[in-house]
Regions:
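RNA pseudouridine synthases
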Residues: 1-387
Length: 387
């Protein structure tokens, strides 16, 4: 039995998946754990399918057969060579352990695998766009993406994307082809989320980094401003994430035992309290589409200025006209969800050194936090007793 953990490519055309859902729309922030889902993953909170993810349950009466042949027979349009490459990269697991292509499947084995996305139907053309490269060597580059930039061409966003900017930046590197799935983006973050991303310049880097995301050995943390005064100083949010049946552009949290959606875990820690809002650090244990945004909405603390999840309403505070004016001013300072991918850590694919990066807040996020600091400094603690 093949479970529908495979996430169809939404990048170049709306497609109808097997549930009858239309996946068109601005959903750049697809699973950021490589969009590893990115079947079970980038992004981040992200971040779409850099990878296809499959889960296959072997029948109880299955005869022993090489796993590459078994999967090629079971999975339509997937070549045996492509499956062998996935095994060589460590992207095929049986019962939670990596196997090679000569492994022989056994009855009731649970097979999970990740396949590089196929070549794009639409060619990615370099565009001269300024990007903030915080680190670069012959294997990879780390970029601090600004809010408002889509990472990959998609419905309604065919120009001005991060990968097109990267293609221009690397135009003098003949071995880098933005249309080659063996190089390029390793994970993603949403259009209106700012922060750090790693780009692989070589197949070696793509495979090594992809494996780290797949095995959850990378480290990524986000800063977010959320509505409300969070009760606990730190905590863990667990709840399956799947598409909201009432709004296909939004994700919804389901009970972990419901069988709906995919397992998602977010860890948070309070950094600062502003009475009616809270600055938090979020660390992803998984990386589902809109994970932080959906989880925070689920526990009653949607991200500030997150229109999709209700964060553009005045959810906490005072009825005074001055407070309403203050909030509207905050909305203008940071006219997007207040979410920034602040840190990124991984092992370098060739030197094996630990690489850790920390980014400054972008100006809109910084001004927003300073505005709330000024607000709290001029407010008495009695104001917040009943919130």
């Amino acid at each position: 039995m093949i479970f529908l953990d495979y996430i169809y490519n939404k990048v170049y055309a709306p497609v109808e998946d097997d549930f009858g859902f239309d996946d068109a729309g601005d959903m750049d922030e697809l699973d950021d754990e490589l969009q590893v889902e990115e079947g079970n993953a980038a992004s981040g909170e992200g971040g779409d399918e850099l990878y296809e993810h499959w889960k296959v349950q072997v029948d109880a009466n299955q005869d022993p057969v090489r796993i590459d042949k078994y999967l090629a027979d079971k999975m339509a349009y997937q070549s045996r060579n492509r499956i062998q490459q996935a095994a060589d990269a460590g992207f095929i697991h049986v019962n939670g352990k990596p196997v090679k292509s000569n492994y022989k499947v056994r009855p009731n084995d649970l097979v999970t695998l990740m396949l590089d996305r196929p070549r794009h139907e639409t060619s990615i053309k370099p565009e001269e766009i300024a990007i903030n490269v915080v680190y670069e060597d012959d294997q990879l580059m780390v970029v601090n993406k600004e809010a408002g930039m889509v990472v990959h061409p998609g419905a309604g966003n065919f120009h001005g994307t991060l990968i097109q900017a990267v293609a221009w930046h690397l135009r003098d590197m003949p071995e880098f082809d933005a249309n080659d799935p063996e190089v390029g983006l390793v994970h993603r973050i949403d259009k209106d989320t700012s922060g750090l991303l790693v780009v692989a310049k070589t197949p070696t880097a793509k495979t090594a980094l992809g494996k780290q995301f797949f095995n959850k050995t990378t480290h990524r943390s986000y800063n977010a401003l959320v509505w409300g005064n969070m009760v606990e100083d730190e905590g863990r949010i667990e709840g399956n994430i799947g598409r909201d049946p009432k709004n296909r552009l939004r994700m919804k949290v389901f009970d972990p035992d419901s069988g709906i959606g995919k397992t998602a875990v977010t860890h948070y820690k309070v950094l600062e309290r502003f009475g009616y809002t809270t600055l938090v650090q979020c660390v992803l244990e998984t990386g589902r589409t809109h994970q932080i945004r959906a989880h925070m909405k689920h526990i009653g603390h949607p991200l500030f200025m997150d229109e999709t999840y209700g964060g553009t309403e005045i959810l906490r505070g005072q009825r005074s006209s001055s407070y309403k004016a203050f909030i509207q001013n905050c909305f203008k300072l940071c006219p997007r969800q207040a979410l920034h991918a602040k840190t990124l850590g991984f092992v370098h694919p060739t030197t094996r050194q630990q690489m850790d990066f920390d980014s400054e807040w972008p100006e809109d996020f910084r001004q927003l936090i300073e505005k709330w600091r000024g607000f709290i400094a001029g407010t008495t603690q009695d104001t917040f007793k009943n919130i």
